[in-house]
Amino acid sequence: AIDCKTVDAALVPCVPYLTGGGTPTTQCCSGVSSIKTMAGTPQDKKDACNCVKAAANRYPNIRDDVAQALPVKCNVQLDIPVSRTTNCDAI
C-alpha cells in the first residue's frame, strides 16, 4: 500500500524546482524514482497519484509546466502526472 507521508517526503526536495524551475536536485530525482518504485500495481499507481495530487495542492505556487517536465528532467519514466488536476481514476 502507498503511504502519502512517504510520497510527501519524496517530493519535498522537489519543491524549489516545482515552484521556480531550473534543474531538479539529485535528492528530488531520487524521490521521483522512489515513487515510481512504490507504484508497482495499478491500484498503487492510483493511490500514489492521489498522494502526488494532494501534495501538489498544498503548494499553490507550483508551476504546472515545470511539474509536468519533472519526470523527464529526472530521466524517470513515471506514469503518474505531477499535477493538481489529474484525474487519478483514469490512470
Swiss-Prot record:
Similarity-based family: Belongs to the plant LTP family.
Annotated S-S bridges: 4-51, 14-28, 29-74, 49-88
InterPro entries named in the record: Bifun_inhib/LTP/seed_sf, Bifunc_inhib/LTP/seed_store, Plant_nsLTP
Highest taxon in the source lineage: Eukaryota
GO BP terms in the entry: lipid transport
PANTHER family linked: NON-SPECIFIC LIPID-TRANSFER PROTEIN 2-RELATED
Statement: the UniProt record of this protein carries the keyword Plastid: no
Protein name from the UniProt record: Non-specific lipid-transfer protein 1
Tissue: Expressed in seeds (at protein level).
Function: Plant non-specific lipid-transfer proteins transfer phospholipids as well as galactolipids across membranes. May play a role in wax or cutin deposition in the cell walls of expanding epidermal cells and certain secretory tissues. Binds to both saturated and unsaturated lipids, with the highest binding efficiency for linoleic acid, followed by linolenic acid.
Residue ranges that the Swiss-Prot or TrEMBL entry lists as coiled coil: none
Keyword Repeat tagged: no
